[in-house]
């Protein structure tokens, strides 16, 4: 494991439109340095074909640093990879975007905001029963996103969610339907 403290990186904290690019550049520079210092000849990136059509500005770093992309070369999509893993009972964690993406661009990133988002997403996941959740942070307003809101609406769980997220520090809790 390569240790990186993103809170020491001003480009990351500024949260400009180029944040993803700067962040990935920081990570990949450290990975490449480690690989060179330890005699690795081959560095692989886990991006797949689905990542090429998503809004992923940091993906250009992969090619700029000459990392190998075997899943893209094999033309595999996220869906195909997940189906293969499930079919073969290979444990994996569903990917989700960086928590910094929950903070609006040009709004300063702080450790407190990231911790608040992390805590809120654990609460949302527990109450909704959904594995993939997002809580977007708009200062005192949280915007919750999950793939199946019926679990919250049908079970009358919104009041519990509202109360729990207000304890975290939000004044208003919204569902993005």
Question: Which positions does each model-derived feature cover?
Answer:
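Short beta-strands and strand-loop turn motifs
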Residues: 45-46, 96-102, 144-145
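Proline- and acidic/polar-enriched loop/turn elements at helix boundaries
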Residues: 3-4, 47, 94-98, 137, ...
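Peripheral terminal appendages
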Residues: 39, 112-177
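A short, flexible beta-alpha/helix-coil linker loop
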Residues: 7, 104-106, 149-150
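ATP-dependent adenylation/nucleotidyltransferase module used to activate substrates
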Residues: 1-87, 142, 156-171, 175
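Mid-to-C-terminal catalytic subdomains of enzymes
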Residues: 72-125, 129-132
């Amino acid at each position: 494991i390569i240790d990186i403290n993103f809170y020491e990186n001003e480009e990351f904290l500024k949260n400009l439109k180029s944040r993803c690019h700067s962040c990935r550049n920081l990570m990949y520079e450290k990975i490449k340095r480690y690989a060179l210092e330890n005699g690795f000849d081959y560095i692989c990136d886990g991006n797949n074909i689905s990542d090429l059509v998503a809004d992923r500005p940091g993906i250009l770093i992969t090619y700029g640093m000459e990392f190998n992309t075997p899943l893209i070369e094999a033309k595999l999509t996220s869906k195909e990879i997940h189906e293969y893993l499930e079919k073969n009972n290979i444990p994996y964690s569903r990917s989700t975007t960086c928590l910094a993406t929950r903070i609006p661009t040009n709004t300063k990133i702080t450790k407190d905001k990231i911790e608040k988002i992390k805590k809120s997403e654990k609460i949302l996941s527990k109450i909704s029963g959904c594995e993939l959740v997002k809580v977007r942070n708009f200062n005192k307003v949280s915007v919750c996103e999950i793939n199946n809101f019926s679990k919250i609406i049908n079970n009358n769980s919104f009041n519990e969610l509202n109360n729990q997220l207000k304890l975290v520090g939000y004044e208003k809790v919204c569902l993005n339907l």
